[in-house]
Curated annotation (Swiss-Prot):
Name by which UniProt lists this protein: Phosphatidylinositol 4-kinase stt4
Gene: stt4
Catalysed transformations (reactions): a 1,2-diacyl-sn-glycero-3-phospho-(1D-myo-inositol) + ATP = a 1,2-diacyl-sn-glycero-3-phospho-(1D-myo-inositol 4-phosphate) + ADP + H(+)
Enzyme class: transferase
This enzyme's EC code(s): 2.7.1.67
Region: Catalytic loop, residue numbers: 1728-1736
UniProt cross-references to PROSITE patterns, sorted A to Z: PI3_4_KINASE_1 (PS00915), PI3_4_KINASE_2 (PS00916), PI3_4_KINASE_3 (PS50290), PIK_HELICAL (PS51545)
Chain's role: Acts on phosphatidylinositol (PI) in the first committed step in the production of the second messenger inositol 1,4,5,-trisphosphate.
Domain PI3K/PI4K catalytic: 1593-1861
Family membership: Belongs to the PI3/PI4-kinase family. Type III PI4K subfamily.
Annotated spans, Pleckstrin homology (PH) domain conferring phosphoinositide binding specificity: 1492-1625
Length: 1877
């Protein structure tokens, strides 16, 4: 090892010793070997390798080793220490130094001086780490100490042999030096905790040396042989050195004994030292005090100084510290300490090294003995001012003193610190000013009477040093006290004291000190400081002071580095620097003599800016500060002031600008680009006078650099802008950043200007330099890879010119540097973006109306924002795919092997199968292009095309990929049975296999338990455990395989998620392929678990929970929440997909089993028979989302039946399949859920395949008549279902429809082939099939046949509500031709139908009324609550008291229901708004109200009184406002605020319009009078506390409909909102109540099919005749208010508020507008909303259009004139928002959504009309009797089929499209009421 470098050898030995076990043993062997060599030959002592060994042992010892290892180390260290000290290993440790030759003396001392202290340090470390070895080590060290003192106490030899005398002297010097080292190591070791026995021993040996006067005996030794070189001790001699080192060790060991470490007593920050209550070491500390007193006595002092021949001040300081330590322990301090301190302070000019000890001493003295506090404070302050300074860069004495001073402030009041700051700051006055304090100081002359006048005079002269000390002191006090006010005070005072009259050194130090304090100051003080720097630097431009300029620059750099990026302080500094550079640039017109330091000042500001912009995230900066504009102005300033790209900027400045450019935002930001050209022309910098010569120079430079640029049509501002862009982006390009130039074109206003071609030219100019610099790099940096990823994302940008420029740049780069695609991240990015673009394009098929705009890659940090226009997405996909192919093919020619390997890696790079999309373009592209890469064997390509096939390399590519996959996770374990197969080897293998089996079994069992207990199981864990177990199972025999396989099959069923089943099915298939003989076992276990799932768990398709009609669910007055029905869809699909995957698995393997394993095939047949029986017995959930699964079950059943038809079982099985198919049609015909076209297409495809198979069966097999009839009926129903779904899939037949399925002919909608015989056999299968058939076909005879079945089979029909509907349709009076007893048992009707049963047209029928009551009572209050207006109106016809009884009973269970009933009854007491004409129902209502109120008691009574009292107080404000009707708005407002203050807020009260929330606060200043001529409505705002469900099961909510029944998983969360409400008086609100009630019903209907439309039925509650409460729509503005704000049109408003048409915000807002426009348009037509002027149309902050004020609906119009003849309002400005024409995609979305909304609500037309019909006699002006209902039904066009209805709606859209009558009405409203349009 001698040939190895010594540092490497030493480090290697150290690392070896730190290793456990084997490494440690090798280390011990090596150490022992060298120790034996040393014993054998002492000459080896000088070998360097021995030294390295010893030092490595010492370093290993410092690590915390085990006890046995520590003993070994101790023995080694003991051996080496004795050898290096030349002591015999005997009991007396005699010296053998004299036996050495004198020639070795000069080399001997440096060697031992290096080694021995290290050994001592290591031994003391062992004492600290291993208490069990402590006594042995201390005993050994004590022996060494005794040996050394014995040698040193030995007198000189008396013989006259000079050689012997020389040896003796050297021996004493040698051992005296090592004794000093001994004490120094003890002192260092005591800094950390040492055991008490070790501390006591150290104190003892120190005391021995100091008492014995041994050092004085060595005074005559030669000092030139002294080894220790120290700044403090050099030249003192051995004697003094021994005194100092032993005293230092004494101090530290005493402190360690007391505080467990030597520094704690002196560290007054951690704690305040004080005398302990218990004093176990009193004797020791008393002896210390006695020794100290001896040395500090006058006799002892003079004696020591006389012997040593020096002042010994440093020693006396140390003695004083030891005395203070001991007296502090004892609790008594002699008065002599202060005298000694004064004496020693007088010596600081001679011995400045005393100061650190004196400072520490005084601080501790002040803490322990408060009587000395002021004494210490005064002297510390004087030291802080007048201490000498040295230019060594270390901490100054002034800093040390002020730091201790500040620490003492913690033990006094904060005022002391403030006073000191003031005192120090007041000393800062230039020497030539009258108030200069330091020029003639007085206080400093009285430190002590013992201080010499010479020292005072010296301090007087050195004022600069004193100024610097004062500044240091202020800084240290501020930073140490750490108080925000202190920071602010220090900054304020130092800024005030700043003066240019100071010496430059003082000014610069003050500036730097401010920087040190600034980062801790609050934001306000920091801003003041930043402005101070800025002002000073601006002044320096005219009056140059380079030192001060540099100091300001350094200070701001320090501040920037000390603040977090994007913090307020960094942002404030950034803003200041930018403004400063701009300001300096504007002074360019100042005469040249005044511009001294102009360029220097600007360059220094730029230098500070470099630090400031580092790491700044521009997106998080405050937008109101306009940082991009400041940067833009800064670059403009640089350009017009000679700092241009073509000018030699200087090396330093160019690097600084390059760093700024790298972190600078674009000169044009997309978010701020709405007025680019005007901002440019009005720019502050560019508006200043720019010399013509400067402009000419800029033009010529641009033309030279970018020859293709055309400057002729550009203005001066635009030319300067281009020059700034060239400078910024060329500098940025040097950092390999090119994408920023492309991003300029994202600004819409820039694109509209004349600059895009110029930007393109600059980009192409920089492109060449970008490629050149990139080609010189040996390795592509990660930042450059990020840049390429940005460029690739820009290649997919939605803006065409951005995309084209990015593609042009990428094409050039890829052609020039094809090896770039050999970088994994870049190639993967190309493929990932291809996949993202494909996914985006398919959104038209999966989520058409609300497409995702932002797409992110899960694998890479990639994101692209795309347009919502699918034609644009198609173009982007086409272009990128074409270029991506070209890039990869080009690179594969240059680096084929790298590209091929990366393509294989990409294909292999996925977590699991469920992470893959069904179609991923990137993966397909990788396969396609990978198989085309030229093979290594080029001979293959000379082969001819045999068999019309051209040879390629696809087989080679797939072979390499397969090998990669096979060996990527190979486990080279002991299970590899190849090779040695001895008996021991086989036993070992079997043993390991058994262990692995147990391990996997335990892991699967743990997985099962966690899932069963509901613990969270990560997908990663589930995948890993099950995969490993499956891989092991296939290697095991049948028993072990069966054990593992059962659990591998069961776990996915327990987890029951799509991902777990995808994994499970993949593994099950793989296991069946690996071990075919176990396939039947696996299939049987899968079927057993599936059957158990169906029977016990009943999830998904086999759930017993049935989805309810939207009319049976609660109706809510809230906006449409798309997330809720998406969550429901995802929940249902997640439980349906597992069944679908299992069916695919079983069906895919059936044929193989049928011909290979008939027993297993029969098992499948029996299972399918079980499933089909479940279906036919209606034990399945026929949810609309399970349509595909249902018909796949039937299709698979038919496949099985085809194999069984020749057997007796076959006919029955086939019949069962047909019955199961018919069962789907036993419910209401439903549309699909959501906008997933792929799902609809799949459903149509499955049904078409099933229909074709049924047709073939009719032709091929003779079947029974009943089976044939059912089969024909099923075919008819399938055709109709497909026709209905096809209509939904293509609601508008335009050219934009994606061709996904074959068109369905209109003939499939007909029902003519359905015969009575078909219905008869269908009735036997399920009566619902017959009952719901008329709902599918517009066929009167079919409906009559269904009615006949009901009449003939009333007992069977009672289970079906629709049967009663047919009876009422044909017998509206209720006189049914059936036994009335059956009515009592009928399925409950919907709550909306209940009140209709009380109307006069239904004849009195007790059974019917009882059935009505049972129906109403079967629904929870949360459902019936919605129908309060209808229930109240039913009292009008309630001759038997049933409705009254229902009201009273329900009111008893729900107080909120009771309150709503009471308010509605009050509102219906009178017919007119003035409450003068009583309604005929008034007596009934009065009676019922009295009963309700009288029945209240207890809490209910109190709640009623609190609520109604509170509400009356609020509404009474309107009455009090009436005298102010003709007063000004401020007067009205003042009156409202006055009354609002009087309102008492009681517990639990609520707004009538918000019964689901409690008022917890009132904004008493929110009152606002509303415009009215003779009434006094007003608006007020309340804080309402509500509850919402968190983690509710969406499926349970949809099924059960109420939050109370939403399952245990749901948790309620409380939240608060501010809700404004309008309190109207004199206006009948009942019509608004009805309208919004109907809108809420429409919302439920639309939600039931997951339709992407938006409605917001806000709340209105009528509380009294002509009175009501109206909720204010939040975050909305009316269209007429936009007109009053001079907005030209809706499109302009959208662009102003949401950005350019290409922006995400605009596209989201436009999508929201389309969704809401479609819903309100359909409802406007159906309910005939009139008076749709712009005052009644609102736009919210998300772009939704909302309608309000429904005073004219149904058969009433303003003025009785039907002015608005259009079906709904569709003006040109609305069309403009939706694309501008009827050919645009958004408008076609509008058409499709209108059609779908119309189709979705048609099945519920009668129920909607029932809600209206019961209100006909209420006296509302909108009704014209029964004619209103007739007209309403006609508008639903129920006589048309689905396609005809869609055409009908399209015709209505065409009629409304820019209708002139609509425009005329808006003009009329503007002329009459001043409403803009």
């Amino acid at each position: 090892m001698d040939c190895i470098d010594k540092s490497i050898r030493r480090e290697s030995l150290r690392k070896l010793g730190c290793l456990p076990d084997h490494g440690w043993n090798l280390f011990v062997q090596s150490s022992n070997r060298y120790s034996k060599l040393l014993e054998a030959d002492s000459k080896l002592f000088k070998a360097q390798r021995i030294e390295d060994t010893v030092l490595s042992i010492c370093e290993v010892t410092l690590e915390n080793k085990a006890s046995e290892n520590a003993l070994t180390l101790f023995q080694q260290l003991r051996f080496y220490l004795l050898n290096y000290l030349f002591l015999e290993d005997t009991s007396e440790y005699k010296s053998v130094l004299c036996s050495l030759d004198e020639s070795v003396y000069p080399n001997l001392l440096p060697l031992t001086a290096n080694i021995c202290p290290c050994i001592l340090k290591a031994l003391l470390a062992l004492v600290r780490q291993h208490r069990e070895l402590s006594s042995d080590i201390v005993k050994f060290l004590n022996s060494i100490f005794l040996a050394l003192t014995r040698i040193l106490n030995t007198p000189h030899s008396s013989n006259n042999n000079p050689t012997h005398t020389k040896t003796t002297i050297f021996e004493k010097v040698f051992y005296a030096s090592h004794l000093g080292f001994f004490f120094e190591e003890i002192a260092d070791a005591c800094i950390s905790a040492l055991p008490q026995d070790a501390c006591l021993w150290a104190m003892e040996v120190c005391n021995t040396i100091l008492v014995s006067d041994l050092p004085c005996k060595l005074i005559d030794l030669h000092n030139d042989s002294f080894l220790h070189h120290s700044n403090y001790y050099a030249g003192f001699g051995l004697s003094y050195y021994l005194y100092l080192s032993s005293m230092k060790a004494y101090i530290n060991s005493s402190g360690c004994l007391w505080y467990e470490d030597a520094t704690s007593f002196w560290d007054i920050v951690k704690h305040r030292p004080s005398s302990p209550e218990e004093k176990p070491f009193l004797t020791q500390f008393q002896s210390i005090l006695n020794l100290s007193d001896k040395f500090l006595s006058k006799t002892g002092t003079l004696r020591l100084q006389e012997k040593l021949g020096t002042s010994c001040n440093l020693f006396f300081v140390l003695v004083l510290k030891l005395a203070l330590l001991s007296s502090s322990y004892i609790g008594f301090v002699p008065y002599t300490y202060s005298d000694w301190i004064n004496v020693l302070l007088g010596s600081i000019s001679e011995d400045p090294e005393l100061l650190p000890h004196l400072i520490e001493l005084m601080a501790s003295l002040a803490c322990v003995f408060p009587t000395h506090f002021q004494f210490a404070m005064k002297r510390l302050r004087l030291i802080a001012i007048y201490a000498p300074r040295f230019d060594d860069g270390n901490v100054t004495y002034a800093q040390l003193a002020s730091r201790k001073l500040a620490q003492l402030f913690n033990y006094s009041s904060r005022d002391t610190a403030i006073t000191s700051i003031y005192q120090f700051a007041n000393l800062l006055s230039p020497a030539d000013t009258p108030d200069s304090y330091l020029a003639a100081p007085k206080e400093r002359l009285s430190i002590s009477d013992n201080m010499s006048s010479s020292s005072s005079q010296t301090a007087t002269v050195n004022t600069i040093s004193n100024y610097l000390n004062v500044i240091d002191s202020v800084r240290e006090i501020a930073l140490t006290v750490n108080d925000e006010k202190i920071y602010g005070l220090a900054i304020s005072l130092l800024i005030q004291k700043f003066s240019r009259k100071f010496d430059s050194r003082v000014s610069t130090e003050l500036v730097r000190t401010l920087a040190d304090i600034s980062t801790k100051a609050n934001d306000r003080d920091f801003s003041i400081l930043v402005q101070f720097y800025s002002i000073q630097n601006k002044m320096l431009v005219k009056n140059g002071d380079e030192a001060l300029t540099i100091a300001i620059c350094d200070s701001r750099c320090l501040i920037a580095r000390g603040t977090e990026s994007n913090s307020f302080k960094r942002s404030d500094l950034l803003k200041s620097l930018l403004e400063e550079i701009i300001h300096i640039g504007i002074v360019r017109d100042t005469p040249a003599p005044e511009l001294k330091g102009y360029y220097f000042g600007m360059s220094k500001a730029v230098q500070a800016l470099v630090e400031c912009v580092a790491g700044t995230d521009w997106s998080s900066l405050p937008k109101e500060e306009m940082y991009p504009a400041l940067f833009r102005d800064m670059w403009f300033t640089l350009v017009i002031n000679r700092f241009r790209y073509s000018v030699d900027l200087g090396e330093t400045l160019e690097v600084d600008l390059e760093n700024i450019a790298k972190n600078s935002p674009l000169l044009v930001f997309e978010d701020f680009g709405s007025n680019f050209e005007s901002n440019l022309e009005l720019n502050t910098v560019l508006r200043t006078h720019i010399e013509h010569s400067v402009i000419s120079q800029i033009k010529s430079e641009l033309l030279v650099r970018v020859p293709n640029i055309d400057l002729k049509p550009l203005s001066t501002s635009e030319i300067c802008f281009l020059s700034a862009v060239l400078l910024l982006e060329s500098l940025r390009c040097k950092s390999n950043k090119l994408s920023a130039l492309v991003e300029y074109l994202l600004d819409p206003s820039l694109r509209d200007s004349q600059l895009p071609q110029s930007i393109r030219a600059i980009a192409l100019y920089n492109l060449t330099s970008f490629v050149e610099s990139l080609s010189k790099e040996r390795r592509v940096a990660s930042s450059t890879i990020d840049e390429f990823q940005k460029l690739l994302c820009l290649c997919c940008n939605r803006v065409d010119c951005v995309r084209q420029l990015a593609l042009e740049c990428m094409n050039y780069i890829m052609e020039t540097l094809p090896h770039l695609l050999g970088i994994k991240e870049i190639l993967f990015s190309v493929l990932e973006l291809s996949s993202l673009l494909w996914k985006a394009r398919t959104e038209e098929c999966t989520d058409q109306y609300v497409p995702q705009l932002l797409y992110k890659s899960n694998k890479l940090n990639l994101s692209v924002i795309l347009s919502d226009i699918y034609s644009c997405r198609e173009e982007v996909l086409f272009q990128f795919n074409r270029h991506a192919r070209s890039w990869i093919q080009n690179s594969s020619k240059a680096i084929p092997y790298q590209v091929k390997n990366l393509l294989e890696s990409y294909l292999a790079d996925f977590v699991d199968f469920d992470d893959l999309e069904v179609v991923e373009l990137g993966r397909s592209l990788a396969v396609e292009l990978g198989t085309r890469i030229v093979s290594s064997d080029r001979d293959n390509f000379v082969l001819p095309a045999f068999g019309n096939w051209t040879p390629d390399t696809s087989s080679e590519f797939m072979a390499e990929y397969t090998i990669r996959q096979r060996y990527s996770h190979v486990d080279n374990s002991i299970l590899n049975i190849e090779g040695d197969m001895s008996t021991d080897r086989i036993d070992l293998i079997l043993n390991e296999k058994s262990k692995l089996f147990e391990t996997h079994l335990a892991a699967l069992k743990s997985l099962e338990d966690d899932i069963l207990q509901g613990n969270t199981v990560s997908p990663q864990r589930l995948r890993n455990e099950v995969r490993k177990a499956a891989a092991h199972a296939v290697q095991e025999p049948i028993f072990q395989f069966s054990v593992l396989a059962r659990k591998i099959v069961r776990i996915p069923f327990l987890d029951f998620s799509p991902s777990s089943f995808k994994l499970g099915i993949t593994l099950w298939n793989w296991m069946m392929n690996q071990v075919p003989s176990f396939s039947s076992f696996l299939i049987s276990n899968i079927i057993r678990n599936w059957k158990n799932e169906i029977v016990t768990e009943k999830r998904g398709y086999f759930s017993t929970a049935k989805s309810k009609s939207p009319l049976a669910l609660p109706m809510t007055y809230s906006p449409t929440e798309r997330a809720s029905f998406l969550s429901y869809k995802n929940k249902v699909m997640s439980q349906m997909i597992p069944h679908l995957l299992l069916l695919q698995l079983i069906a895919g393997n059936f044929e193989g089993f049928w011909y290979g394993d008939r027993q297993t095939a029969k098992l499948i047949v029996h299972f399918m028979k079980f499933v089909l029986k479940k279906i036919t017995s209606m034990e399945v959930n026929l949810n609309v989302l399970t349509r595909e699964l249902h018909f796949k079950f039937v299709s698979f059943g038919l496949r099985i039946a085809e194999n069984l038809l020749n057997s007796p079982l076959g006919s029955r099985f086939y019949n069962l399949c047909v019955d199961a198919g018919l069962c789907w049609f036993s419910g209401m015909p439903n549309w699909t859920y959501g906008a997933d076209k792929l799902h609809v297409a799949a459903e149509i495809s499955v049904m078409r395949s099933l229909r074709d198979k049924l047709d073939s069966f009719l032709l091929r097999y003779p079947l029974k008549v009943s089976t044939t009839l059912k089969q024909k009926l099923l075919i008819i129903l399938l055709n109709n279902e497909m026709y209905m779904l096809y209509t939904w899939l293509t609601p508008v037949l335009h050219g934009r429809n994606v061709r996904m399925v074959e068109p369905i002919p209109d003939s499939d909608a007909a029902s003519s082939p359905i015969t009575l015989e078909m219905l008869q056999v269908a009735w036997n299968v399920s009566p619902n099939i017959v009952l719901y058939a008329p709902k599918r076909f517009q066929n009167a005879p079919l409906k009559q046949m269904a009615l006949n079945f009901v009449i003939a089979n009333p007992f069977t029909s009672v289970k079906h509500e629709v049967a009663l509907e047919y009876l009422f349709e044909h017998y509206p009076s209720g006189e049914f031709p059936i036994d009335r007893k059956f009515i009592l048992y009928w399925e409950p009707m919907y709550p909306v139908s209940g009140p209709v049963m009380f109307m006069p047209n239904v004849k009195w029928n007790p059974q019917l009324l009882q059935y009505t009551m049972r129906s109403m009572e079967s629904y929870p209050v949360s459902v019936t609550f919605f129908y309060v207006p209808q229930i109240v109106q039913s009292l009008r016809y309630d001759s038997m008291g049933y409705a009254e009884s229902f009201i009273l009973e329900t009111s008893g269970t729900s107080q909120l229901f009771a309150h709503q009933i009471l308010w509605n009854m009050k509102a219906n007491l009178y017919k007119d708004e003035a409450a003068t004409v009583p309604d005929s129902i008034k007596p009934i209502l009065d009676r019922v109200m009295d009963k309700m109120i009288n029945s209240l008691s207890g809490e209910d009574k109190q709640f009623y009184e609190r609520e109604f009292t509170f509400f009356n107080e609020v509404t009474s404000i309107s009455g009090k406002l009436k005298p102010f009707i003709r007063k000004s708005k401020p007067e009205k407002k003042a009156k409202i605020d006055e009354e609002m203050k009087k309102i008492k807020l009681d517990v639990g009260v609520y707004l009538p319009s918000n019964p689901d929330g409690v008022i917890v606060g009132i904004d008493r200043k929110s009152g606002k009078p509303l415009q009215s001529h003779a009434k006094a409505p007003f608006m007020a705002t309340f804080k309402i506390r509500k509850e919402k469900l968190v983690d509710a099961d969406p499926e349970e909510l949809a099924v059960n409909g109420t939050e109370e029944e939403a399952g245990d998983s749901a948790k309620k969360q409380t939240y608060e909102v501010w809700q404004s409400a309008i309190f109207k008086v004199g206006d009948d609100c009942r019509q608004d109540v009805l309208t919004l009630q109907l809108i809420a019903m429409f919302k439920n209907i639309f939600n039931s099919v997951g339709l992407d439309v938006y409605l917001f039925p806000y709340r209105v509650t009528a509380t009294n005749p002509g009175c009501g409460v109206i909720d204010v729509l939040p975050n909305c503005i009316s269209r007429d208010m936009l007109g009053r704000e001079a907005v030209n049109g809706l499109y302009d408003y959208f662009r102003t508020k949401f950005g350019d048409e290409d922006s995400i915000a605009f596209q989201k807002a436009r999508s929201n507008f389309v969704q809401s426009m479609a819903a309100y348009s359909v409802i406007t037509y159906l309910l005939q909303f009139k008076d749709r002027h712009n005052g009644n149309i609102m736009i919210d902050d998300q772009g939704h259009i909302l309608h309000i004020d429904f005073g004219f609906i149904f058969d009433i119009a303003p003025g009785g004139i039907t002015f608005e003849s259009a079906p709904f309002k569709l003006t040109t400005e609305m069309i403009a928002v939706m694309g501008g024409s009827n050919k645009s995609q958004p408008f076609q979305w509008f058409q499709e959504l209108c059609v779908k909304a119309f189709l979705a609500c048609r099945p519920y037309a009668h129920y909607i009309c029932q809600a209206v019909e019961v209100m006909l006699d209420s006296g509302l002006p909108c009704f014209k009797g029964q004619l209103t209902i007739t007209h309403c039904l006609e508008r639903f066009a129920l006589n048309l089929n689905e396609r005809q209805a869609s055409t009908f709606m399209l015709h209505l859209i065409e009629q409304s499209y820019a209708n002139k009558r609509t425009l005329m009405y808006d003009q009329f409203q503007k002329a009459t009421n001043g409403i803009p349009y």
